[in-house]
């Protein structure tokens, strides 16, 4: 069932909510690492080209599909072609899997924010602090529950009064915090015991200057795949979120303009995240100090904050507050997608479905927390990495399902339904879709090929073939 009046009030509300979904912890803990690893400005250039081509195609497809059908992913694909009903069910699985662990990560962020509020944070910078926390029995569950309760409360309030209102308040604050921390990072300097001086501006050069040293065709393809995977996960596509948010967009909204603004917003935040983190890590830990994922946020950066001296604690508080905003906006979008799909599937009101999804999220998140102690195991994944329960959920959703869903969606839109179906929705109010020709070419030929390659690489099939 679709709620009466379940829609964003206008274009701004939609853009801020969608950008909030796209701007998650992945933008902040993965984008800077890939920049440092993949040639700085070279990676930035490749990423920007992909945003303007590949990114806009996937984003436009999801949003237009949602608005045209006024349905969530579970029913939207079925309304296009009953034979493709299964694609809606596959898409529904992605947020269902992501929801199992996203509130756990949100709880980690809440814990570090609380630590810096009540202390100078020196414990957080010590070796083994993060491992000790996530392997404990009670603390991770408590902080996860706090984060999950806040997420559920926002979703419970509905689209306009909950998600849109929250996004209008939080997103400007998130951007302001990122800009302030980024500017501060550029002013930093540090002298090692051997007299070597490193500055934030030198770190900025590491970030922006293209590094072509040792570049080969194989190396460029690796950079291309890294940029593609980052873009793919950054824009919240192929997980039903943008289809759901698209179904809340009013018909009079200029869809082309709105999706362009989301692209700019998401790319801008990713760029600022790199400017915020790379110079700071470079100053205190050197060029080889960059890490990815939880290691960057919860191990490397606390050491950087500790090395800042008197400025470390306020910067850490601002940083983890900003991280909390980013995690919360993304988690809200994941939970809203589950709630909206369940409302449509079971024909129950928001309050009941929010309660049901909340219970599901709590139970599964507790299991993820226990995956670091009582239920700990190590499993070698098909892509060669080794992980435990959280990593398995992340792998299935991000590395397996999302590329596969994008591949199938491009085939459905490009060859079964036809690109003009999406283009017609974008031009619903007489707007000119300037990139219509590019969209046709990309959705038919480029997206299927690239998504197939990404799927084969991320699932390990490429290594088996070679």
Predicted regions and their residues:
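Inter-helical loop and helix-membrane interface segments of multi-pass membrane transporters/permeases
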Residues: 2-6, 34-38, 71-90, 103-162, ...
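A generic transmembrane alpha-helix motif of multi-pass inner-membrane proteins
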Residues: 383-414, 434-466
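Membrane-water interface regions at transmembrane-helix termini and the short interhelical loops
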Residues: 34-38, 64, 79-80, 86-99, ...
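Membrane-interface "cap" regions at the ends of multi-pass membrane proteins
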Residues: 1-29, 58-63, 67-79, 85-86, ...
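Membrane-embedded translocation segments of transport machinery
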Residues: 2-8, 168-328, 332, 352-353, ...
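Loop-to-transmembrane helix boundary motifs in multi-pass membrane proteins
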Residues: 13-14, 21, 137-142, 265-271, ...
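Hydrophobic alpha-helical segments of multi-pass membrane transport proteins
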Residues: 327-333, 354-368, 372, 391-425
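Transmembrane helix-boundary motif of multi-pass solute transporters/channels
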Residues: 10-48, 241, 257-260, 264-267
């Amino acid at each position: 069932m679709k709620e009466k009046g379940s829609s964003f009030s206008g274009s701004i509300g939609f853009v801020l909510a969608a950008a909030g979904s796209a701007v998650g912890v992945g933008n902040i803990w993965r984008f800077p690492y890939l920049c440092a690893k993949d040639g700085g400005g070279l990676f930035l250039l490749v990423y920007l080209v992909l945003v303007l081509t590949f990114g806009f195609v996937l984003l436009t497809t999801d949003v237009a599909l949602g608005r045209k059908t006024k349905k969530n992913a579970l029913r939207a694909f079925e309304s296009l072609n009953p034979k493709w009903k299964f694609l809606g069910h596959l898409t529904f699985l992605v947020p269902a899997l992501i929801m199992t662990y996203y509130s756990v990560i949100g709880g980690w962020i809440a814990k570090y924010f609380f630590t810096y509020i009540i202390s100078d944070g020196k414990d957080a910078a010590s070796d083994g602090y993060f491992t000790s926390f996530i392997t404990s029995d009670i603390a991770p569950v408590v902080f996860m529950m706090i984060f999950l309760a806040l997420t559920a409360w926002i979703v419970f309030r509905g689209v306009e009064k909950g998600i849109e209102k929250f996004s209008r308040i939080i997103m400007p604050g998130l951007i302001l915090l990122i800009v302030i921390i980024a500017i501060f990072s550029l002013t930093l300097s540090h002298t090692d015991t051997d007299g070597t001086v490193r500055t934030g501006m030198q770190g900025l050069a590491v970030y922006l200057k293209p590094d072509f040293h040792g570049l080969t065709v194989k190396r460029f393809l690796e950079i291309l795949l890294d940029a593609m995977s980052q873009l793919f996960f950054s824009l919240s596509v192929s997980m039903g979120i943008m289809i759901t948010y698209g179904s809340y967009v009013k018909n009079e909204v200029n869809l082309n303009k709105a999706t362009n603004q989301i692209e700019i917003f998401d790319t801008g935040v990713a760029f600022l995240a790199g400017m915020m983190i790379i110079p700071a890590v470079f100053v205190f830990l050197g060029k080889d100090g960059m890490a990815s994922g939880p290691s960057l946020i919860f191990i490397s950066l606390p050491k950087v904050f500790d090395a800042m001296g008197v400025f470390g604690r306020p910067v850490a508080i601002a940083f983890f507050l900003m991280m909390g905003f980013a995690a919360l906006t993304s988690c809200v979008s994941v939970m809203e997608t589950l709630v909206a799909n369940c409302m449509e599937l079971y024909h129950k009101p928001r309050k009941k479905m929010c309660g049901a999804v909340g219970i599901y999220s709590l139970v599964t998140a507790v299991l993820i927390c226990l995956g670091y102690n009582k239920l700990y195991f190590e499993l070698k994944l098909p892509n060669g990495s080794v992980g435990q329960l959280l990593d398995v959920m992340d792998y299935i959703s991000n590395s397996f399902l999302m590329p596969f869903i994008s591949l199938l969606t491009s085939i459905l839109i490009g060859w079964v339904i036809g690109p003009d179906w999406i283009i017609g929705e974008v031009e619903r109010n007489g707007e000119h879709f300037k990139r219509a020709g590019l969209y046709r070419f990309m959705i038919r030929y480029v997206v299927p090929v690239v998504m197939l390659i990404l799927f084969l690489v991320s699932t390990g099939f490429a290594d088996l073939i070679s």
